[in-house]
């Protein structure tokens, strides 16, 4: 597979075209951002860690019949993926109150929820990725009702698979965000699943093992990501 021109650069990844019009190469960077890009930094080897973590988790989901854009890991920093048309939504899955939801609703972080909460965020940096509801998404043409149902059904299955997987590793899956795209008119999971996109707490100590360590200047960010990869690799 021949690597071509860079066609997109985001906060954490670069996307390159290939000699196959249906495939791209995704490169994972060490750049770290928080608060919609207001806080910026670098975490040594973060790209390597997130590539390895995401590759393992996407392989797990594929084995459990979740369609994804992932094809294979090429090297420490790169994956071969299907070229998808990204749907400009983030689906945020909240199993435990934390982060912005806890602040917004006046809940103590770590409060158990009586049901898992799904939130939608409209992916638009200029607007600060606002929270929207299903009606907004349909009204402004982001997705149809049928597409939202597919996305929610997939999201529920992904949450079940990942929550059980992490529980076996001694990790609480507090919340996470997902992105989806269309490949030949089929909705597939895209982007990444990593400590950049999940809140992951040690099940015994509640130690944070995710990007909150960067957001909140807690230190030992790389070590937390390494611990997640170690537990996944030892499984």
UniProtKB/Swiss-Prot annotation:
Any one GO biological process: 'de novo' IMP biosynthetic process
Keyword tRNA-binding included in the entry's annotation: no
Top-level EC class: ligase
Keywords on record: ATP-binding, Ligase, Nucleotide-binding, Purine biosynthesis
MF terms in GO: ATP binding; phosphoribosylaminoimidazolesuccinocarboxamide synthase activity
Catalytic activity: 5-amino-1-(5-phospho-D-ribosyl)imidazole-4-carboxylate + L-aspartate + ATP = (2S)-2-[5-amino-1-(5-phospho-beta-D-ribosyl)imidazole-4-carboxamido]succinate + ADP + phosphate + 2 H(+)
Entries under InterPro entries matching the protein: SAICAR_synt/ADE2_N, SAICAR_synt_PurC, SAICAR_synth, SAICAR_synthetase, SAICAR_synthetase_CS
Functional pathway: Purine metabolism; IMP biosynthesis via de novo pathway; 5-amino-1-(5-phospho-D-ribosyl)imidazole-4-carboxamide from 5-amino-1-(5-phospho-D-ribosyl)imidazole-4-carboxylate: step 1/2
E.C. number: 6.3.2.6
Signal peptide segment: none
PANTHER family named among the record's database cross-references: MULTIFUNCTIONAL PROTEIN ADE2, SI:DKEY-6E2.2
Similarity comment text for this entry: Belongs to the SAICAR synthetase family.
NCBIfam families (UniProt xref): purC
Designated name of the protein: Phosphoribosylaminoimidazole-succinocarboxamide synthase
Gene expressing this chain: purC
């Amino acid at each position: 597979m021949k690597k071509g021109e860079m066609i997109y650069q985001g906060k954490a990844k670069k996307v390159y075209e290939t000699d196959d019009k249906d495939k791209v190469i995704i490169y994972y960077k060490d750049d770290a951002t928080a608060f919609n890009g207001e806080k910026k930094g670098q975490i040594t080897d973060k790209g390597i860690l997130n590539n390895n973590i995401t590759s393992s988790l996407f392989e797990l989901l594929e084995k459990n019949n979740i369609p994804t854009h992932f094809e294979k890991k090429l090297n420490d920093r790169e994956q071969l993926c299907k070229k998808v048309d990204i749907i400009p939504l983030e689906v945020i899955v909240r199993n435990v109150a934390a982060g912005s939801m806890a602040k917004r609703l006046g809940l103590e972080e770590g409060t158990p929820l009586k049901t898992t909460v799904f939130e939608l965020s409209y992916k638009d940096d200029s607007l600060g990725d606002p929270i929207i509801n299903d009606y907004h998404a349909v009204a402004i043409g982001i997705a149809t009702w049928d597409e939202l149902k597919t996305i929610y059904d997939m999201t529920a299955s992904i949450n079940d698979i990942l929550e059980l997987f992490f529980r076996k590793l001694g990790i609480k899956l507090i919340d996470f965000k997902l992105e989806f795209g269309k490949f030949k008119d089929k909705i597939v999971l895209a982007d990444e699943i990593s400590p950049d996109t999940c809140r992951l707490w040690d099940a015994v100590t509640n130690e944070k093992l995710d990007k909150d360590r960067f957001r909140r200047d807690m230190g030992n960010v790389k070590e937390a990501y390494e611990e997640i990869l170690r537990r996944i690799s030892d499984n």
